[in-house]
């Protein structure tokens, strides 16, 4: 079996990626979230496949087809809630994975990092088009508001919006194409994941100390397969508790009302994992400026490898940047809270301050603290 594992053309790839892969001996549980994201992706594809068997992407029957899945399909309610809450678990793991990458300086592996940003954007796009499919009030108005942002693009904006809608408003054509996008994008994500792993295995993984670990490697199996399995058990336990006991806690009550173009909800807001970006979008009074800020809130992650001037790897021995990092995380939570609040004083003011802090920590404070710490080392 050992000979076959190492010589067979297909098994050899799996062996070098998951069995005999040399891994640093000191990587902590923060490194588990990559494998957890893989599990989340598999859960989403499988539950999504079963949902697609019963869902109809037509404006007249979409809402009732989701109700039919929950009421008449065997364990349809469970599949639906696993899929909906699986998306939340996916984004929790994604945020922690990116946060760990920033804290431990994983962005120095720039190819892996940049593919990760593309993955982040693609996952956000997938979640957005997926949220439209149940055709509830928030689905319809969320789709209308977010797609309408493209009209801010000079010259081609209005044409582009009508092209995406497939008409002059969000309607049957929009729902059908969003369903098509939602079905194909997870497979594109899977392809990008393989590229992400390819680049990661070219350079080897980072580790908490930030030091070169070439002299101290251990095989991935059994050490990290067991560790990942423990993480997967915790993930599945959290997902099942969420889906079985609190299935609607992260959803919006408005989405249990069928879409009505003549009745606008009091507060249009996206799912919780988009609220930080939505708060940044709303904090800028100009439409085009808001759209650019929204895009920059994610794309700015690509600036980390470019702005990194530190002589040390990661933040483990850098108290100044550590403090700024935790300010950044706290600020992100504030933005998430503000994104779910109505557009009125003092929320607008807090949102604007938090948006400035968000960009300032990445562009100004972290590079400045890098320079300060480099000078301290010289003393």
From Swiss-Prot:
GO cellular component: a single term: mitochondrial inner membrane
Record-level Gene Ontology MF annotations: metal ion binding; ubiquinol-cytochrome-c reductase activity
Record-listed heme b b562 binding positions: 83, 182
GO biological process: mitochondrial electron transport, ubiquinol to cytochrome c
Membrane topology of this protein: Multi-pass membrane protein
Subcellular location: Mitochondrion inner membrane
Main subcellular location of this protein, as a coarse class: mitochondrion
PROSITE patterns: CYTB_CTER, CYTB_NTER
Record-linked SUPFAM superfamilies: a domain/subunit of cytochrome bc1 complex (Ubiquinol-cytochrome c reductase), Transmembrane di-heme cytochromes
Pfam family, one: Cytochrom_B_C
Cofactor binding note from Swiss-Prot or TrEMBL: Binds 2 heme b groups non-covalently.
Superkingdom, taxonomy of origin: Eukaryota
Binding site for heme b b566: 97, 196
Transmembrane parts of this sequence: 33-53, 77-98, 113-133, 178-198, 226-246, 288-308, 320-340, 347-367
UniProt keyword list: Electron transport, Heme, Iron, Membrane, Metal-binding, Mitochondrion, Mitochondrion inner membrane, Respiratory chain, Transmembrane, Transmembrane helix, Transport, Ubiquinone
Cofactor requirements of the protein: heme b
List of residues binding a ubiquinone: 201
Family: Belongs to the cytochrome b family.
Assembly and interaction partners: The cytochrome bc1 complex contains 11 subunits: 3 respiratory subunits (MT-CYB, CYC1 and UQCRFS1), 2 core proteins (UQCRC1 and UQCRC2) and 6 low-molecular weight proteins (UQCRH/QCR6, UQCRB/QCR7, UQCRQ/QCR8, UQCR10/QCR9, UQCR11/QCR10 and a cleavage product of UQCRFS1). This cytochrome bc1 complex then forms a dimer.
Function of the molecule: Component of the ubiquinol-cytochrome c reductase complex (complex III or cytochrome b-c1 complex) that is part of the mitochondrial respiratory chain. The b-c1 complex mediates electron transfer from ubiquinol to cytochrome c. Contributes to the generation of a proton gradient across the mitochondrial membrane that is then used for ATP synthesis.
Further comment found in the protein's record: Heme 1 (or BL or b562) is low-potential and absorbs at about 562 nm, and heme 2 (or BH or b566) is high-potential and absorbs at about 566 nm.
Protein name, entry field: Cytochrome b
């Amino acid at each position: 079996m050992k000979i076959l594992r190492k010589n067979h053309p297909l098994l050899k790839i799996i062996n070098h990626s998951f069995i005999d892969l040399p891994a640093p001996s000191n990587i902590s549980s923060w490194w588990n979230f990559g494998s957890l994201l893989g599990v989340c992706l598999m859960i989403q594809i499988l539950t999504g496949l079963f949902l697609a068997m019963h869902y109809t992407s037509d404006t007249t029957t979409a809402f009732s087809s989701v109700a039919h899945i929950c009421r008449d399909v065997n364990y349809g309610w469970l599949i639906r809630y696993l899929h909906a809450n699986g998306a939340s678990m996916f984004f929790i793991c994604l945020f922690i994975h990116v946060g760990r990458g920033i804290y431990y300086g994983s962005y120095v592996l720039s190819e892996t990092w940049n593919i990760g940003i593309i993955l982040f954007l693609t996952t956000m796009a997938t979640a957005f088009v997926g949220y439209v499919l149940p055709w509830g009030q928030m689905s319809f108005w969320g789709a209308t508001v977010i797609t309408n942002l493209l009209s801010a693009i000079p010259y081609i904006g209005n044409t582009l919006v009508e092209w995406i809608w497939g008409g002059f408003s969000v309607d049957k054509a929009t729902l059908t194409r969003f369903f098509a996008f939602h079905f194909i994008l997870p497979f594109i994500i899977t392809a990008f994941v393989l590229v992400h792993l390819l680049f990661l295995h070219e350079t080897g993984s980072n580790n908490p100390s930030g030091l070169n670990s070439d002299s101290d490697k251990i095989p991935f199996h059994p050490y990290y397969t067991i560790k990942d399995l423990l993480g997967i058990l915790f993930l599945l336990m959290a997902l099942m508790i969420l889906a079985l006991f609190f299935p609607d806690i992260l959803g919006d009550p408005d989405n249990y009302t069928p879409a009505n173009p003549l009745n606008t909800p009091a507060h249009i807001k996206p799912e919780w994992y988009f609220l930080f970006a939505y708060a940044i979008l709303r904090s800028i009074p100009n439409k085009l400026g808001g759209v650019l800020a929204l895009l920059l809130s994610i794309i700015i992650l690509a600036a980390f490898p470019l702005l990194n001037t530190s002589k040390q790897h990661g933040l483990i021995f850098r108290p100044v940047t550590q403090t700024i990092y935790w300010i950044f995380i706290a600020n992100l939570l504030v933005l998430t809270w503000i994104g779910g609040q109505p557009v009125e004083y003092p929320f607008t003011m807090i949102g604007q301050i938090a948006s400035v802090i968000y960009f300032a920590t990445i562009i100004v404070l972290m590079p400045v603290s890098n320079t300060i710490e480099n000078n301290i080392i010289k003393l």
